[in-house]
């Protein structure tokens, strides 16, 4: 069977609060690891750290890529425009953990909203 990369999170964040209970993302990662598929995870949450053990296993056999979006360096503003997700600082810390685990990451600066977070100060702060 030809292998490919599976992806989750392109339309909505897979690590919603309910995921703490149902653990569907973890189950999907386990299946990907068992069958030898790579995995791309797109999230604004640091909750994926719960599954770091499986992400490392997948990355050893095939490849894992974690993509995260950064919107603003202002933590209070982040909490207002992106409630219920990890703050920029928490995401940055999670990205450092992934780097230390040799897991490739992609960072998106998005959305860039005119007159809201498109300032030079914000972009340099991120």
Positions of the model-derived regions?
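Conserved AdoMet/S-adenosylmethionine-binding subsite of the radical SAM
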Residues: 1-126
